[in-house]
C-alpha cells in the first residue's frame, strides 16, 4: 500500500530520532525537503540544529509564527513499526516527528498559496531538554524575523482524530528538573558506626519531600514533586558513600515554584545537618508556564468551531511542561492539543499516533493561517 507524501515524511523522521542539540540528521532532512520547494519567496536560516524558514507574504503587515519541536527521547522503541527507530535507545515517543511533519506540510501549502502576511516556521531543537526555545528566541537569527503572533501544537493520545483541545490563559505548568547529590562516608556493612550511610539519608529525603506539597502549597494551586530515580551504593555489604536523587517539580503558579524550591532547600539543609553529609542541589532545565493569549485563543477556537470540520474541546490545565512557554511569554499566541487517538500515552515506548491526523492537521492549519494572514 502506498502512503501519502506527508505520512512518508513522518515515517522518515520517525526512523531518525535524536536528542536535544544533536538533531543533525533531522535538521538535514528538513533542509533537504525545503530544498525541493519553490524558493522564490523563501528565506532559510539554521540555528544550531534548528531551522528557521520565512515565507514572504504578498502585502505583509505582520509576521505569523509556527513552531514545531524536532527532538526525540532516550527511550527504546516497542511499537513494532516497520519504520521503527534505527537509532538504538532513542525514539520519537512524544510526537515531535508529527509536529515537524505538520510544519513541513503547512510550509508546503504556504509556498503554493501565499498569503498577505509573512510566515515564519521555527523547527526547534531540544524541547525535551536542555531547552531550545529560550536560546533560540534570544538568537540573532530569530530576532530578525521575530513573529508578531505565534502558534504551536502538541499531539494528545487521549483525544480522537479530528479533535483539538485548548483554553484561554494557563494551559501547561511551570516545570523544573531536580537533582540532589548526597555525599557521606562509606564503609563495611558490619561496622555502620564508622560510616555515614547515604542510602538512609536519601530515603529520609524522599519521604520528607512528600510533605512539601501537602503542607506548603495551597490545595487550590496544584503542584507536584516526583522523584523518579535514585542511585547509590555498589554491593550489598558496603555502606554507600554517595547517592543521587533525580526528579521533577511542577507548579501551576510561579509563586508556588519559588515556594516549593525554598522548602526543598530547607529540607536538604536539614538532611545535611542530621546526617553530617554534603548535599548539592541542581535544578537542571526549567520551563516557563504555557499561557495562551486570551483574545487570540478565543478567536482561534471560534474560527475552528464555525469554519472547520474539527471538534473543539475546552480543556483544563495540565501539569505538562513545554518550553514553548518562553516564546508565549514574549510573543502573543497559543498552543493546543491535537488528538491522535493512541492507546499508549506520551513518552511511552508503544506510542502509536493515528497517521490520519497528519493531512487533517495540515488542511486545518492552512485554513486558519490563510484566514488570519489575509485579514486586515
Swiss-Prot record:
Protein name listed in UniProt: N-acetyldiaminopimelate deacetylase
UniProt KW Amino-acid biosynthesis keyword: yes
Xref: HAMAP family: DapEL
BP-aspect Gene Ontology terms: diaminopimelate biosynthetic process; lysine biosynthetic process via diaminopimelate
Pathway(s) the chain acts in: Amino-acid biosynthesis; L-lysine biosynthesis via DAP pathway; LL-2,6-diaminopimelate from (S)-tetrahydrodipicolinate (acetylase route): step 3/3
GO molecular function, one term: N-acetyldiaminopimelate deacetylase activity
UniProt superkingdom: Bacteria
Class of this enzyme: hydrolase
Family to which this protein belongs: Belongs to the peptidase M20A family. N-acetyldiaminopimelate deacetylase subfamily.
Gene3D superfamilies with a match to the protein in the record: 3.30.70.360, Zn peptidases
Keyword Ribonucleoprotein: no
Annotated catalysed reactions: N-acetyl-(2S,6S)-2,6-diaminopimelate + H2O = (2S,6S)-2,6-diaminopimelate + acetate
Entry's EC annotation: 3.5.1.47
Entry-linked InterPro entries: AcetylDAP_deacetylase, Amidohydrolase, Bact_exopeptidase_dim_dom, Peptidase_M20, Peptidase_M20_dimer
Described function: Catalyzes the conversion of N-acetyl-diaminopimelate to diaminopimelate and acetate.
Keywords: Amino-acid biosynthesis, Diaminopimelate biosynthesis, Hydrolase, Lysine biosynthesis
Active site: 69, 128
Amino acid at each position: 500500500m502506498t502512503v501519502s507524501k506527508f505520512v512518508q515524511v513522518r515515517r522518515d523522521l520517525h526512523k531518525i530520532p535524536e536528542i536535544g542539540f544533536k538533531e543533525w540528521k533531522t535538521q538535514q532532512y528538513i533542509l533537504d525537503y525545503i530544498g525541493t520547494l519553490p524558493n522564490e519567496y523563501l528565506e532559510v536560516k539554521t540555528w544550531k540544529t534548528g531551522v528557521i524558514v520565512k515565507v514572504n507574504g504578498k502585502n505583509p503587515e505582520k509576521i505569523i509564527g509556527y513552531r514545531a519541536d524536532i527532538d526525540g527521547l532516550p527511550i527504546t522503541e516497542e511499537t513494532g513499526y516497520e519504520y521503527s527507530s534505527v537509532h538504538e535507545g532513542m525514539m520519537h515517543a512524544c510526537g515531535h516527528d508529527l509536529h515537524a511533519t505538520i510544519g513541513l506540510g503547512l510550509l508546503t501549502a504556504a509556498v503554493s498559496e501565499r498569503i498577505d502576511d509573512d510566515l515564519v516556521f521555527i523547527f526547534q531543537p531540544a524541547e525535551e531538554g536542555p531547552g531550545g526555545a529560550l536560546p533560540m528566541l534570544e538568537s540573532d537569527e530569530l530576532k530578525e524575523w521575530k513573529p508578531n503572533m505565534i502558534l504551536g501544537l502538541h499531539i494528545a493520545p487521549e483525544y480522537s482524530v479530528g479533535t483539538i483541545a485548548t483554553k484561554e490563559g494557563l494551559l501547561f505548568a511551570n516545570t523544573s528538573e531536580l537533582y540532589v547529590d548526597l555525599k557521606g562516608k562509606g564503609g563495611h556493612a558490619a561496622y555502620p558506626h564508622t560510616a555515614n550511610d547515604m542510602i538512609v539519608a536519601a530515603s529520609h529525603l524522599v519521604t520528607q519531600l512528600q510533605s512539601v506539597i501537602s503542607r506548603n502549597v495551597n490545595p487550590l494551586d496544584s503542584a507536584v514533586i516526583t522523584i523518579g530515580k535514585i542511585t547509590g551504593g555498589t554491593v550489598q555489604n558496603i555502606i554507600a558513600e554517595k547517592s543521587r536523587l533525580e526528579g521533577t517539580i511542577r507548579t501551576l503558579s510561579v509563586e508556588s515554584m519559588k515556594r516549593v524550591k525554598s522548602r526543598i532547600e530547607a529540607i536538604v539543609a536539614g538532611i545535611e545537618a542530621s546526617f553530617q553529609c554534603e548535599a548539592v542541589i541542581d535544578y537542571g532545565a526549567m520551563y516557563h508556564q504555557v499561557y495562551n493569549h486570551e483574545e487570540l485563543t478565543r478567536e482561534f477556537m471560534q474560527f475552528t468551531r464555525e469554519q472547520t470540520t474539527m471538534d473543539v474541546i475546552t480543556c483544563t490545565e495540565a501539569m505538562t511542561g513545554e518550553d514553548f512557554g518562553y516564546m508565549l511569554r514574549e510573543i502573543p499566541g497559543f498552543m493546543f492539543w491535537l488528538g491522535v487517538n493512541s492507546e499508549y500515552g506520551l513518552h511511552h515506548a508503544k506510542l502509536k499516533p493515528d497517521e490520519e491526523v497528519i493531512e487533517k492537521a495540515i488542511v486545518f492549519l492552512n485554513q486558519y493561517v490563510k484566514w488570519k494572514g489575509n485579514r486586515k
